[in-house]
């Protein structure tokens, strides 16, 4: 086989494999809140500090398998403004409908980066998280992290706005 043919076959194989790992093409909802100041106040406190995170993630994965949705693991803490802004955005009616249609969501309290690190480690994230919220989008069938390298992109949510959060989530919906 010539080098050119080998290169052409390798390129074709890569092109066929790319859609399997590329973000999805789902239209995001139009969010009614123009800014975070439009969200309900006080912002939600979504993380249960006493919950058994391993059991919660396992139960959520089972629900995702049964409903053919992606698993969305939201790692954060109630002390984190960006985490609470994400939760407040997800609580908007149009976002709630969108998220419920595409994901099974589980929130996991990470304390002050000193709890439930095994959840992130299970999906290949080594060491301490770079920021929160860390959002892991998982294929429940393979238990594979679909947004590897992008899990902490919402850690500065306050600089994004509600529509940008909706757009980000839509990238990973199926």
Pin down the residues of each PLM region.
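Structural alpha/beta surface segment adjacent to cysteine/selenocysteine redox centers
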Residues: 111-131, 141
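Non-catalytic, surface beta->alpha helical segment in thiol-disulfide oxidoreductase systems
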Residues: 129-174
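Thiol-based oxidoreductase modules, predominantly thioredoxin-like and allied folds used
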Residues: 51, 88, 92-117
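N-terminal leader/targeting and pre-domain segments
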Residues: 25-67
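Short pre-active-site segment immediately N-terminal to redox-active cysteine/selenocysteine motifs
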Residues: 68-71, 76-79
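Conserved redox-active cysteine motifs that mediate thiol-disulfide chemistry
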Residues: 77-90
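Bacterial N-terminal signal peptides
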Residues: 7-18
């Amino acid at each position: 086989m010539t080098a050119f043919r080998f290169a052409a076959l390798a390129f074709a194989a890569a092109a066929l494999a790319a859609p399997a790992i590329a973000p999805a093409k789902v239209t995001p909802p139009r969010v009614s809140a123009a800014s975070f100041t439009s969200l309900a106040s006080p912002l939600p406190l979504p993380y249960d500090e006493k919950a058994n995170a391993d059991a919660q993630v396992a139960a959520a994965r089972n629900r995702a398998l049964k409903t053919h949705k992606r698993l969305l693991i939201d790692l954060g803490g109630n002390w984190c403004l960006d985490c609470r802004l994400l939760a407040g955005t997800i609580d908007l009616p149009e976002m709630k409908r969108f998220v419920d249609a595409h994901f099974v969501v589980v929130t996991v309290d990470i304390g002050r980066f000193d709890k439930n690190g095994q959840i992130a480690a299970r999906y290949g994230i080594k060491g301490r998280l770079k920021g929160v919220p860390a959002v892991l989008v998982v294929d429940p069938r393979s238990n594979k992290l679909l947004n590897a390298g992008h899990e902490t992109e919402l850690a500065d949510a306050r600089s994004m706005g509600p529509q940008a959060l909706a757009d980000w989530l839509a990238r990973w919906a199926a």
